[in-house]
Amino acid sequence: MNQDQALKAVVEPATMETDRFGHPLDPIVRYARGSILKSSDEEIVRMLRARQIVGERVRKSGKDSVYDLSGMNRGSGITVQDVPHLTSHVPFFAHFEGKTEPLALKHMGADPARHAALILNRVSAANFIALTTLLKLGARVFAFAPTGGQTHPSAVRPISMVSADFREFHSYTELAKAWEAQGAPRLLLITPISASKRHLPFAEFKQALALPRSHETLVYVDDAHMASRIAFFDEPPTYQVGDIDLAVCSADKHVAGPRAGVLVGRTDLVTAIGSRAYELGLEAQAGQYVGVGNALRNFDPGAVKHAGELAKRLIQVLAEKYGPKRAYLGGPGVSIAGDDVLEMALERGGARGKPGLVAVEAAGLVAMQMLEQDGILTIGAVAMPGSAPAVRLMMYPDGPRLGIEPIVASLERSIDRLSRLVHDVPAARAQLLGG
């Protein structure tokens, strides 16, 4: 048994789950692997190819020729004024050391008297180091994720690595029933907004935090999309929701900062986790640390709200075109699940039988087509391995600049293209991976 098989064995259900078309679901990422995107290796090739397409387009036609509908910024976040103090670690220590953590506490609504912050190089790094520090063999983890969404693979993987017992719930009723029957777990892991942009009802979020705990129970919130919760759903920052021990948010998801994880929690927990993070080199480096500070200081919910208003108009158009059960409002954007996109392509092309593609490949093909032909950059093109298999059209940051009509037209052309590729695996492979 190799390492990947060993990790999957820990979370493998007794009965193998399948997608709508009968393909078995990978128990870590919770979507089907196909003949093209067979593993993380191929997903990385697709991601790097998309980056190359963006680069070539910008070099040829300028950066405004790409319309960023990813919901992310991922720039450096540093200013011209910052640069002279980043020439070595000496001026960095004098001007920036210790300045970002207080901003992180404020951003997440934490209490400086009880909480501390740690700036890490990714949310995935935060999930990895926090969960492998807090959990051990056999520890029970109850995960609470939105209906239609899942706990992120970056959290499932470390839970599997330590051989903890992972169970996922999608309603408060299910969670409370298991809690009463089995007792409080070691860890309650809550995902308020999933990678597929499904949203956990706020009332259920609060109810979960109110469940009775043992002296060993910890609550960890993967609040990567906290900015959307605040700006679009009008919910409070993480630590204003209820009693939480540890939480992470992103510095780049609907925040104008670099890709980084902002980990905030009880001081004793952050101290222990921080020691291991420094051992493994997961801490944010100088420029990233400064960029995170600037992004948190300058976070503008208004820009996200504005994008959200455009998303509300877009969902009306797409729900009418594709059906209200297929297109759904995912915060300040619109999403369509990969299985639905694949089904739409089959219907449009009149194809019969089991498709030659799986959901993650179908969603990826739509994303790559929109990027190559129209310069529209979505998460599905540049996402890391494990990202949800869905077409996600986030209106931040460039939705207002592009407008609804070009977005709808590009999506239509891309689904048409997909309808011609559902049984043409070689052509689909060429578009996803190149060569």
Model feature map: region roles:
Residues 2-42, 327-429:
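Conserved C-terminal alpha-helix-loop-beta "cap" of PLP-dependent enzymes
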Residues 2-13, 17-19, 24, 99, ...:
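Conserved PLP-enzyme active-site core in the AAT-like
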Residues 29, 37-129, 153-157:
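Conserved N-terminal alpha-helix of the aminotransferase class I/II PLP-enzyme fold
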Residues 90, 262-265, 349-351:
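Short, surface-exposed, charged loop/turn segments at secondary-structure junctions
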Residues 96, 306, 362:
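Soluble or luminal CAZymes and related metallo-dependent hydrolases
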Residues 305, 433-435:
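Short, low-order "capping/linker" segments at domain edges
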Residues 309, 313-329, 339-341:
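C-terminal structural cap/anchor segments
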